[in-house]
Structure formats: structure tokens, C-alpha cells
Amino acid sequence: MRGQFWLVMSCYIITIICKLAFCIKLIENEKSIFGFKSKKKDMKKLSNIKVRNWKQKKIQQFFIINKVKNKKYNNLKKSLNMEYSNTDDQRLSLLKNLENKSKIITQSPAWNEKIPLLEINDLHAIEVEGGKEILKGINLTIYLGEKHSIMGRNGSGKSTLAKVIAGHPYFKVTKGSMKFKGLNLTDLTVNHRSLCGIFLAFQYPIELPMVKNNEFLRTALNCHRRQNNEPELSPSEFDLLMINEIKKVGLSPEFLDRPVNYGFSGGEKKRNEILQMLILKPSFCILDETDSGLDVDSFKLTSDIIQKFSNINNSFLIVTHYKKLLELLKPNYIHIMHKGKIIKTGNYSLVDKIESDGYAQFVEE
């Protein structure tokens, strides 16, 4: 009898468990129908969605990166393997994008020191965006060994003239001519002008956050050394050269490891421009308000360097508002600009007249 009792009880317990399991399953199904899923399942589903989206994003990035890499590779391949190019023009256009290490012409065979270093005749230039005319008939002649200064009111076109000579892409020459060492300057690229010996120290030096100063300077110097048939400098050789040069401008060696002009003070930026001038040794230096924004010590240091660097083998075009720098450099000629034209040229005595009576005496309103 006892065995039969436990058998009946076991069957009864199993029946209850099965009914409970059925009820639980039924409740879960009802929740699923009406959108009431368990939090655990929701979290699991959300996690799966995030993982899926992350994978899709990574796949997209992979294809985009490889697309860019393939494009660069194909361009290089096309330029080196001529089977993809149908004409000589196509081959030349592709090769122009590669670094050109060949020598270029930096002066006319007929040019000598008795011929003007820079000769500008009736120069007109406009802004590329907007088409506003800034330069309206500039005439300027500079010989080797001379120092010229451009002065004038704000907005008269001084900085624009400096940038047009250097080949700034924001401006376009519409009329007139510029010759440098006998070459037609308007036909030359910015890099070509630099190799010819033209150097521009910006009023507001550009920041290059991703380029270290030593890499920038060494690359620029090696371009000039190649042009002069001199061996390129390795990083270690360049560092040795810079030990003395960087001291001249009052900067520490750690300065070379910093990005170009990024996070620099105003004085450091200007001294960095002067450092470039010392390294590249250009024959024509354009200083666009290099003296502005400098404290007393930085101004004295900068002006002393410019004065020592100036010699019979180079020329200067100095854009400034201040008499103090001109007192030290003693330019041969002073030019006054107004509304895109040079309206007056004279010797250093013009500086004293400007200092006493301003520009109104030279301007016909």
C-alpha cells in the first residue's frame, strides 16, 4: 500500500510541474505578442544590434581606406607603367604629380648683376574669389644688393604685392609683367620661384599641426641643395647644422620637434620665419610686417639678424608701418602705396615726412 501511495504522489507532482511549465510558456508567448519582452532579452538584442552596426562601420571604413589607397597606387602605377596611358599628354599630366627632382632654370642666361633682379611693369592683380582688383598698375625695379621699403595706409595693397611676387594662389595677375633674374615670373610656380631665390616671410605665418619643424626645414633645404648640385642632408647632418642656426634666432633645440608654428607665440612665429631665411639663403627676401607684434627683445634680435644677413648678394623688400626697423636697415628707396598704386618713391627722408605729417600730404583725395 505504501508503494502505491508514493507512486500516485509522484504522478501528481509531475502533473503539477508540467502545468506550471505550460503556464510560464503561455505567459512568455503573450508578452512576446504584445511587445513585453524581458529586459534580459532586450539588452541582448540591443547588444547584438550595436555589434552588428560596429562591424558594418568597420567594414565601410576598411573599404573607404582601401579605395583611397588603391586610387593612390593606381595613379602611381599609371605614371610609372605607361601601358594605361594612351597619349604623351596623359603621361606627362600623371608624372607632374610626382616629386620632381630634376634641375630647373633659375635665371636667364643673359641675366647679370647690372640687370634688375626684379622688374615689375604696370602690374594689375585681382582676388581669385570675388574678382576684386587690388593692384592697379604697379611699377617697381630692384637691383641686387638694394633694400626697398613699401609703406602706406592699411588696405593700400602692400601685402598683396608681396604675395603676388611670391605666387600666392589667392591672387591672379590680369595685366602687366614681372621679371626675376630675366625670367617671366608670372609663368613660374611657387616652388620654382622659391628655387630662383624668392623668399616671403608672412605677416601671419601659417600653422602646420601635422608637420614637425625639423622635417619641414630639412625638406626645404634639401630641395635647394639638389638644385645647387649639393648632396642632401640626412636627419643627423641637418641636426648638427641647426645647432648654431637655431641659437642665432634665440630658440631652443626642442623647438625643432614641435609642429610648424603650431602653438607658437607671435614672436616665435616671426623668429621661425627668420630661421627659414637663414637656412635657405635667398637672393630676394620679402618681409611682410615682420616687425609687427614683437616685444622689445624679439624686435632687437630680429632686426640684428636681418641687418647681418643683408649684403651685396641679396636684396630686400620690406613691408612695414614703423620707422624703427627702417632706422636700423637704412633702405635705399622708400615707396608709398595708395589704392593699389605706388604714388611716391624717394630716399630715407620720406620716412621722416611720413612720421611728422602722415600720408595725407602724398595722397590726392
UniProtKB/Swiss-Prot annotation:
Name of the gene: SufC
Protein source organism: Plasmodium berghei (strain Anka)
Function per UniProt: Participates in the sulfur mobilization (SUF) pathway for iron-sulfur (Fe-S) cluster biogenesis. As part of a complex consisting of SufB-SufC(2)-SufD, involved in assembly of [4Fe-4S] clusters. Exhibits ATPase activity.
Listed name of the protein: Iron-sulfur cluster assembly protein SufC
Reactions catalysed, as given in the entry: ATP + H2O = ADP + phosphate + H(+)
Annotated GO CC locations: apicoplast
The keyword Hydrolase is assigned to this record: yes
GO terms for MF: 4 iron, 4 sulfur cluster binding; ATP binding; ATP hydrolysis activity; metal ion binding
Assembly behavior: Component of a complex composed of SufB, SufC and SufD in a stoichiometric ratio of 1:2:1. Interacts with SufB. Interacts with SufD; the interaction enhances the ATPase activity of SufC.
Disruption phenotype: Repeated attempts to isolate gene deletion mutant failed, suggesting an essential role of the gene during asexual blood stage growth.
Pathway noted in the entry: Cofactor biosynthesis; iron-sulfur cluster biosynthesis
Ranges of residues in domain ABC transporter: 118-364
Keywords: 4Fe-4S, Apicoplast, ATP-binding, Hydrolase, Iron, Iron-sulfur, Metal-binding, Nucleotide-binding, Plastid
